[in-house]
């Protein structure tokens, strides 16, 4: 076995590889950028080498620096993780040229599967079913439009070198094709350095099912069953499971065999994933092959009991596959939820900032957390905003869903937006619970998933106020004078009456406590609520409320209190005299940047007339392109940025004047 390997990646996947390497007695070398100098993968590795500035193009995508780091440290092999250089044939070739083992497939296999158009031609020869479409080399815009017209709408424009949901556009009308093509090519060029695209018929209500395959240098191939990755936002997976529920067994077997045929067709070695787009009747079409380990590989590990990173290392070292096909079986059901720093209610835009509080669920044989993030870490604009992957196992799908709901209820994040509450609602959603799965599930259920009730139970408001009251009492046990009155958000009067003032969602909340026996009577919104409480620690309130004893998790900051209950979080701000509740969205006449990024297109100038939904400019953030659109028919008063400019979240991009209604 290897004595030392270098991991050419960061975050949770680097930590994941290090964990298995340690188990096998293999020394590890991490690489890091400026932003990652104190990252967990750097601390976990035996050695760490600095490779450049924070932008990935100046660090994690620098092939020469990574190769040199491996040579300088004596690493015999490089594990690429996923993303970054994991599917880069030039990187694999550089490893080969420097006598370093690339822990992945041969260069020829990466080349064959790296471009969607090329891979589809190979799969057609191998008898693997394909979605109807155009996969050729002619990239003339008018020609591609004609192909789309011939295929029939809706169609998908897909970057030939794409992946991860990037470089993809759904086009439903012929007149929208050329603008969508330009946007797709721009994103593909920025993300992959290759603007070639292919056109495919869009399958209505498709499922996204993938098969995990492995090959070795001895000509052996196996599959480790399938994963359903249908639940997606922005064409990116967010909740995955294994095995795929409610699929006919004969259809699954056909997919599994097609996946092995695909791997064999390119003499594949190592871990690979063959992805299929699946119609509701179970008919499957080859979509692409990912020549690397997938983000969602843990669900396969949970149902098979296999360590796929260990398989990768053994196969790369020249050993045969650890198991033959007849030795692999499915045990139970597993789910993976990707916990992101993002704002689901704002179109899932990434959230940037510091994680002020982080509590992971307790891990066990049934609950696993893969992460490279700890409390105090920054989520930056440079990399993917994933906080962690939460993976659960149950004896069946129903048990796994229950386990996931419970684990999400123990997963607490504060300091920046996150999708935990969204994930919990997703798990509880009837469509998901009943396995009515397709890639449009989130959009179809957005009323339930993205627009939770703004109402909040009085008991939670009173509990938040009680935490503030008890915190001040703990800090000031026997006050000699009413110093608490100096606080703008609460006060104590001479009749043992305590008033706490909070704010939630712009609404002022006033809660008055009067002492009674061992607890308080809280007056709020016309209700009288008896409550007793004790701070168990800095993040737990033990309380007796409405005759029930319970514990409530919370976090506090200088700005306010966040309560965590049943997968949901409830944020309360301290009410201050100088509180200024500014609209984050700007006014209709002032369009602002939803997040930090780079302006990639400016399509309007001052005095231009535009129609509602016209794209005014595009903003790229984390390699995803966002369109800034006109909210109404109107005139551009001013455009404040040019192509290539960096913008911050909240920067005013365009001053927009709606057209006055025409008088008849």
Features from the language model and the residues they span:
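Short acidic-glycine loop/turn motifs at beta-strand connectors
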Residues: 173, 215-220, 279-282, 362, ...
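Catalytic cores of soluble metabolic enzymes centered on carboxylation/carboxyl-transfer
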Residues: 259, 298-528, 649-655, 661-664
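Conserved nucleotide-binding/hydrolysis modules and their immediate coupling elements
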Residues: 307, 516-519, 525-540, 544-550, ...
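Catalytic P-loop NTP-binding/switch module of NTPases
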Residues: 555, 559-593
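Structured functional modules or segments
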Residues: 581-664
């Amino acid at each position: 076995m290897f004595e030392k390997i270098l991991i050419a990646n960061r975050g949770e996947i680097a930590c994941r590889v290090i964990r298995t390497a340690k188990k096998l007695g293999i020394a590890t070398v991490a690489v890091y950028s400026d932003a990652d100098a104190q990252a967990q993968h750097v601390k976990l590795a035996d050695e760490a080498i600095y490779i450049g500035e924070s932008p990935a193009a100046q660090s994690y995508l620098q092939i020469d620096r990574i190769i040199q780091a491996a040579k300088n440290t004596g690493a015999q092999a490089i594990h690429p993780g996923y993303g970054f250089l994991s599917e880069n044939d030039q990187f694999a070739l550089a490893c080969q040229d420097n006598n370093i083992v690339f822990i992945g497939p041969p260069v020829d296999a990466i080349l064959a599967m790296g471009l969607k158009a090329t891979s589809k031609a190979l799969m057609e020869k191998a008898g693997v079913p394909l979605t109807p479409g155009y996969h050729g080399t002619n990239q003339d815009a008018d020609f591609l439009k004609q192909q789309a017209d011939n295929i029939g709408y809706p169609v998908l424009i897909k970057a030939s070198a794409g992946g991860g949901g990037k470089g993809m556009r759904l086009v439903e009308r012929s007149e929208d094709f050329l603008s969508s093509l330009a946007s797709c090519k721009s994103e593909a060029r920025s993300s992959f350095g290759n603007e070639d695209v292919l056109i495919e018929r869009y399958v209505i209500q498709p499922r996204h099912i993938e098969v995990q395959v492995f090959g070795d240098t001895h000509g052996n191939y196996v599959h480790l069953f399938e994963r359903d990755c249908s639940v997606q936002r922005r064409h990116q997976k967010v909740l995955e499971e294994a095995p795929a529920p409610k699929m006919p067994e004969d259809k699954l077997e056909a997919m599994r065999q097609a996946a092995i045929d695909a791997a064999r067709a390119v003499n594949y070695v190592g871990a690979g994933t063959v992805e299929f787009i699946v119609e509701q009747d179970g008919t499957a079409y080859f979509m692409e092959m990912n020549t690397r380990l997938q983000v969602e590989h843990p669900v396969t590990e949970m149902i098979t009991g296999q360590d796929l990173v260990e398989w990768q290392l053994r196969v790369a070292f020249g050993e045969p596959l650890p198991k033959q096909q007849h030795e692999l079986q499915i045990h139970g059901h597993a789910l993976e939820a990707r916990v992101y720093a993002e704002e689901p209610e704002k179109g899932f835009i990434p959230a940037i900032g510091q994680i002020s509080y982080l509590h992971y669920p307790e891990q066990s044989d049934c609950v696993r957390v893969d992460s490279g993030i700890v409390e105090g870490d920054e989520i930056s604009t440079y990399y993917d905003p994933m906080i962690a992957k939460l993976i659960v196992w149950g004896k069946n799908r129903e048990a796994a869903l229950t386990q996931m709901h419970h684990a999400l209820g123990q997963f607490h994040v504060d300091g920046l937006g996150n999708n935990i509450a969204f994930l919990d609602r997703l798990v509880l959603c009837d469509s998901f619970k009943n396995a009515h799965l397709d890639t449009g599930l989130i959009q179809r259920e957005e009323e339930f998933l993205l627009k939770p009730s703004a109402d909040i139970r009085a008991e939670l408001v009173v509990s938040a106020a009680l935490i503030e009251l008890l915190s001040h009492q703990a800090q000031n046990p026997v006050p000699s004078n009413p110093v608490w009155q100096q606080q703008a958000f609460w006060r104590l009067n001479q009749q043992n009456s305590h008033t706490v003032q909070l704010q939630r969602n712009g609404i002022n909340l006033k809660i008055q406590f009067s002492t009674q026996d061992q607890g308080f009577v809280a007056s709020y919104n016309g209700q009288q609520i008896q409550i007793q409480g004790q701070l168990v620690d800095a993040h737990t309130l033990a309380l007796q409320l409405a005759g029930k004893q319970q514990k409530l998790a919370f976090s506090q900051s200088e700005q306010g209190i966040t309560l965590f209950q049943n997968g949901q979080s409830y944020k309360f701000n301290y009410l201050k005299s100088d509180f200024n509740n500014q609209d984050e969205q700007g006014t209709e006449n002032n369009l602002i940047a939803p997040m930090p990024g780079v302006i990639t297109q400016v399509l309007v100038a001052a005095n231009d007339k535009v129609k509602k939904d016209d794209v005014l400019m595009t903003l790229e953030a984390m390699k995803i392109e966002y369109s800034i659109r006109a909210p109404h028919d109107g005139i551009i008063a001013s455009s404040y940025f040019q192509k290539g400019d960096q913008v911050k979240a909240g920067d005013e991009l365009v001053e927009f004047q709606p057209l006055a209604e025409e008088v008849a």
